[in-house]
């Protein structure tokens, strides 16, 4: 059973360092890259063993998880199975064998809204919500080596990227859509391919944190 994080450091400090400096200089304004934000990593929040346990033993159902490859979603029928809960038939249960087979073939595993079901992340998200006075959703992305999970895109929400395991190259450009609203999910014409050098180009290592404002 998952237990709350053992870290005594406040969640916002683990992500962004000094809270006042973060709000003054970065919140909704500019990216922030912190090397070694978690000196001991972030394994207390979610480890690779935890991901394996979630997929293999808890029988999650879509849309609590999904798979994408080269920026495109894979059909749920490719990685789900049928089952029963008592007398109720189910058709959207995780099929661990298919999931890990697709993962080794280059697909990214996405676990969604983990703050609802994984105790360490429930507590972590609640701390961030109290500081930011804003709802927090926690997703986990597990991408195999030499693969690309998502293509160039913009988000309608601010993002904290916590690198838990492995290394990943990130490129962040200036906002394509300044302060986008929730319905503004599509890039404007001509913004699909960013021009000019990125504001941030960095390979994240375990314990690093990258904050990206929406847009």
Language model features with spans:
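Non-catalytic, conserved peripheral segments adjacent to functional cores
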Residues: 28-30
């Amino acid at each position: 059973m998952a237990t709350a994080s053992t870290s005594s450091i406040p969640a916002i400090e683990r992500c962004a360092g000094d809270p006042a400096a973060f709000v003054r200089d970065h919140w909704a304004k500019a990216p922030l890259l912190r090397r070694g934000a978690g000196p001991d990593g972030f394994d207390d929040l979610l480890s690779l063993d935890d991901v394996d346990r979630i997929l293999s033993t808890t029988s999650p159902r879509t849309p609590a998880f999904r798979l994408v490859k080269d920026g495109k979603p894979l059909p749920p029928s490719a990685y789900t199975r049928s089952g029963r809960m008592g007398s109720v038939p189910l058709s959207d249960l995780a099929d661990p064998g298919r999931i890990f087979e697709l993962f080794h073939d280059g697909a990214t595993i996405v676990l969604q809204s983990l703050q609802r079901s994984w105790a360490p992340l429930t507590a972590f998200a609640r701390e961030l919500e109290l500081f930011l006075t804003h709802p927090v959703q926690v997703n986990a992305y597990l991408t195999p080596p030499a693969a690309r999970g998502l293509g160039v895109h913009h988000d309608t929400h601010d993002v904290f990227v916590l690198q838990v395991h492995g290394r990943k190259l990130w490129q962040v450009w200036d906002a394509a859509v300044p302060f986008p609203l929730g319905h503004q999910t599509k890039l404007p014409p001509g913004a699909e391919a960013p021009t000019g050098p990125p504001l941030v180009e960095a390979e994240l290592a375990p314990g690093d944190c990258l904050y990206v404002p929406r847009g």
